[in-house]
């Protein structure tokens, strides 16, 4: 909600809550839902070099359980600012990394100052806000490599709270 909300009229809890509610009320689901959502359940396999059980083989889980352990959905936010911009939410158990982050992926510019061949292997520009672990912000973008050659490479600028401050911060959801 914080990413999609408009700027509050004042920096108070009530004003922020009001703007968050506005954006949450503007959320639309894909229609039909199956076209923009996926869900699943992890099965046995390998994780970090170790053999792991599937969800149905876990202790206290019925062998015929249909409980999802992964879900992803593409949402819309019907506001002037966000109309036509997809928001993706993904959550799951036993994924390769335990991470909570917000990734804002920018559209490619219609006109780039570099030729297409110089940039075709570049990733998208991104702003990644890491909530946990390793709280911080990363800005990923393409940058020209110094020198006379026309070469552009993906680079990242990182800010880590733990490296910048000695004071301890509360847990992400405290």
What are these model-derived regions, one by one?
Residues 1-173:
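Secretory/organelle targeting and membrane-embedding segments
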